[in-house]
Amino acid sequence: MLEDEYQIDFFSDNGFVRKQCPTCGNFFWTRDIERSTCGDAPCDPYSFIGNPVFKKELELPDMREFYLNFFEEQGHTRIERYPVIARWRDDIYLTIASIADFQPFVTSGQVPPPANPLTISQPCIRLSDLDAVGKSGRHLTTFEMMAHHAFNTKNEEIYWKEHTLELCDGLLNSLGADPMAVTYKEEPWAGGGNAGACVEVLIGGLEVATLVFMNLKKDKNGDIDIKGDMYSKMENYIVDTGYGLERLVWASKGSPTIYDAIFPSIVNELMGLAGIEHELENNEYSHILSQNARLAGLMDISEKANLLELRKQVAASIGITADKLSSIMEPVENVYAIADHTRCLTFMIGDGIIPSNVKAGYLARLVIRRTLRMMKDLGIMIPISEIIQMHINNLPEYPEFQKRFDVIKDILEHEERKFAETLERGRRMMEKSARHYKESGEKMPLETIIDMYDSHGIPPEISKAVASDVGVEVDLPDNFYSLVADKHSQSEEKEEKVVPFADKIARLPKTKRLFYDEPNRMDFDAVVLEVFDNHIVLDNTLMYPEGGGQPADHGTLTVEDVVLKVVDTQMYDGVVVHTINEIEDELHIRKGDMVVGRVNEKRRMAHARHHTATHIINDAAREVLGSHIWQTGAQKFADRARLDISHYKRITQEEANQIEIIANHTVMKNKRIISDWMDRTEAEQKYGFRLYQGGVPPGKMIRVLQVGNDIEACAGTHCTNTGLVGPIKILKTERIQDGVERLEYAAGEAAIIAMQDIETLVRDSSETLRVSAEQLPSTIERFFDEWKELKKENNKLKEELAHSRVSQLVNDAEDVNGIRIITKAIPHADSEELTKTAGELTQESNVVAILISEMDGVKIVATAGDDAVKRGVNVGAIVKEMSTMVGGGGGGRPNMARGGGTDPSGMDNALSRSVELLKEQLN
């Protein structure tokens, strides 16, 4: 369908011919009329290894600067890189390509680009080939996608296919590439809801760039089929290119692997720590690595069978056995993977990702734990942060990482401790699960291994080893980590908000919202535009519709002498809908009526104070805990509010106190709160992506709010000065999930009431204990110590009482076929006392003890000695039936059971029934 898209004058004007590759079937363009294959692996092997394709070797910084300078000279504006965590997106967690920086707002035409045309070197993270990293010689988790982009509209074309190809060809020529060796392979591209013609740029068997001409959008009614999906033409059309920085460096050096090309000093350091002699000047060793990378380029090695086939082919080509080759390659591949993964973590944590069990944090923890496992296997005993420091030393162009290193180090140390605890706990958990499958004779399914990793952090290698020790078979795919990473890389699709009366709302103009310009005004006049059921739409309103964690305004609407109570305010597609308390027989309001609205001022101001306090607390938390703090959720109420932030450990009381003091300092400074509607691109360039702490708002214009040092995109209502917030009191902190801390607080009058409640609690406690408030802590501590001593004494007395009872109970035992049965009701005994007594009674193996008591309900404890169990006694079954007779439940093992209920009237019958059941079991 896209064949016409490739009829480009650049090719015909520069001596290219179009051919079809006999191996893959794709069409490609080449200046070499003798060439038959497309130049891409596996159709062509890596010929650049040991034979660099450019005129000189370039290191990463040099190649990056060469590229960016080249495009600046060609009229492009260089822009700064975006973070690897896609803060401006709610559909992906990680930045996976340079074009992701400009989706969805720029690519859709809603927002102008930061420059046009532009050039960038964007660090990206893709974990879909995680298991191939190290093994293939070419795969990376983190890479820089150098790019030049042009955003064309129907009114203005910057440049399109012709100039894009000219620029690419010119860049390669300036690097010293042989024009006859470069091929352009046709390969339609699709992704992120867009598609277009694309050419892959190849040299020496290596793809070094991709040139996408994005001019299609996904459309089920479209007429263009690409990879099974239908597309239609876009009004705008975009040049989306990607040049692999690391691949270009590798091609310039011709190193055996990409890892030796891009971080050789770190590879060598790690090889030394692992006790591996990594001497690339050794021709035999270098030949093994080179041959492995060459042949790996010819196949997908994510599958175990393909990896084994690769081993066989490489071994045969160099004259050694596959086992010998594996013994050489596996440790080296692990070192390569560690070097790659730690660079990935440098960007992940350096850009603010906090390891956790959800979203981007899950992916960071996945990489951390895979790295730690490989380090352990190789005997590399240094902290992972030391390797991160090596990378930071090699990345002076990213000074932000060095500034954040103390936090990066603290996070990683915390993760290492957690992983050690997980392994200890996980082995026991896995053994239990494996025994279950062994008893049932089943093979352990992959779903169980994934659940053990997802829910409990147990690495699949540990699960497989433990299961194997127990004698349970496990099929573990070689691409396990890639599968898990893919599963967690896409954000959950948001449920679309159901719009009631959508047909009526669609015909209405957007409501003018007055509360932004006049935040202190509470009365307004308006015209009724529509009435349906108990919902009213006005031409303008001062009532704030629910959003951004702020509840809806309430108030009244008055028409003539009738006052209608507004109990909810919502907004749908810019139309604000006011909900009246109830549907009356006849709603006293009609379309076209003039109404007087009044906002419930007390509720509004309570919400505004708490919303402004949320911004103040967020900023204070960042100052106390570190720049990695990121808002993950917030909710405001009239009497309190809460803020959820990403943080890798519990907030201490001292830290909470500091946050509270700093927040109140901001209040006392009485700073003016500044709000402004700004162009999205301008706001992002000025303030960065911290704008989107509270979420990513749609549209070209966004409302930017500055509260003290906190600057965010926010559409809520606020105080006009920080002083109007009043006192802020942090009520508590708690960990709501791994990696997320919640602060709960109150502001203004609500804070005063909260503090008064605390004072009342302290005063009442002091009066109860008859001490002053200052003496409360020491008095409570003394009482607690005394309570512990009394508890010890009580336990001792219970043991003595149980011991003294035992002899009497043994004397009263009934003999049934050589088994001595003791059934007894013991008044006012708790479960602990019953258990101790029953335990002593059954120290003799032919004794069965069933004891019952009434204390906070009915308690039942039964035990049986070994001989009794061998004779068929099962006290678990007996206690189960007894418990139903006293209005409860219970059960247990044949030798030990507990139960109880709420109906003491059934105790005698239950005890009698226990004797009958015992005799049945023994006969």
Curated annotation (Swiss-Prot):
Region (Disordered) location: 886-909
SMART domains linked to this entry: tRNA_SAD
Residues involved in Zn(2+) binding: H611, H615, C714, H718
GO cellular component, one term: cytoplasm
Subcellular location: Cytoplasm
Enzyme Commission number(s) from the entry: 6.1.1.7
Tagged with keyword Metal-binding: yes
Major localization class: cytoplasm
Protein keywords: Aminoacyl-tRNA synthetase, ATP-binding, Cytoplasm, Ligase, Metal-binding, Nucleotide-binding, Protein biosynthesis, RNA-binding, tRNA-binding, Zinc
Cofactor note: Binds 1 zinc ion per subunit.
Listed cofactors: Zn(2+)
Molecular function GO terms recorded: alanine-tRNA ligase activity; aminoacyl-tRNA deacylase activity; ATP binding; tRNA binding; zinc ion binding
The keyword Membrane is assigned to this record: no
Pfam families attached to this UniProt entry: DHHA1, tRNA-synt_2c, tRNA_SAD
UniProt-listed Gene3D superfamilies: 2.40.30.130, 3.10.310.40, 3.30.54.20, 6.10.250.550, Bira Bifunctional Protein, Domain 2, Threonyl-trna Synthetase, Chain A, domain 2
BP GO annotations: alanyl-tRNA aminoacylation
TM region positions: none
Family (UniProt): Belongs to the class-II aminoacyl-tRNA synthetase family.
Function of the molecule: Catalyzes the attachment of alanine to tRNA(Ala) in a two-step reaction: alanine is first activated by ATP to form Ala-AMP and then transferred to the acceptor end of tRNA(Ala). Also edits incorrectly charged Ser-tRNA(Ala) and Gly-tRNA(Ala) via its editing domain.
Official protein name in the record: Alanine--tRNA ligase
Organism of derivation: Methanococcoides burtonii (strain DSM 6242 / NBRC 107633 / OCM 468 / ACE-M)
Lineage: Archaea, Methanobacteriati, Methanobacteriota, Stenosarchaea group, Methanomicrobia
